[in-house]
């Protein structure tokens, strides 16, 4: 299964045009994510594909907690421009910041992502 969460998490300082969620709002919505799903989010999880140009992590704690708890096979995110096309792992979960360029992933018949 696939599960998605849109919007910037945590709330960003970009003004009224930005659709954002608080960490608490994201936690509630992520409760419905099935175990071992493919998780598609706008924001990355904290400490995975989330560093800005200055090296500051901008990712979401709520998304990271959901990854640790639900163990998705794959997490596809974007949002943090300086980390586009980066890959990382949280446990057995592959995290990919696809950015606007996209990324090519290989999924084996047994569900392994590389």
Positions of PLM-derived features:
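Histidine-centered catalytic micro-motifs
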Residues: 40-45, 73-83
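Binuclear metal-dependent phosphoesterase catalytic core
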Residues: 8, 64-74, 82-114
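Conserved catalytic scaffold of divalent metal-dependent phosphoesterases
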Residues: 1-58, 62
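Generic alpha-helix signal with a bias toward terminal, lower-confidence helices
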Residues: 14-17, 53, 79, 92, ...
């Amino acid at each position: 299964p696939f599960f998605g969460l849109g919007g910037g998490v945590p709330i960003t300082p970009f003004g009224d045009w930005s659709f954002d969620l608080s960490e608490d709002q994201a936690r509630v919505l992520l409760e419905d994510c099935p175990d071992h799903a493919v998780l598609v989010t706008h924001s990355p999880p904290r400490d995975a594909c989330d560093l800005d140009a200055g090296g500051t992590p901008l990712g979401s704690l709520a998304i990271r907690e959901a990854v640790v708890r639900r163990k998705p096979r794959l997490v596809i995110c974007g949002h943090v421009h300086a980390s586009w096309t980066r890959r990382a792992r949280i446990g057995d979960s592959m995290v990919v910041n696809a950015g606007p360029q996209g990324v090519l992933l290989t999924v084996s018949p047994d569900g392994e992502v590389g």
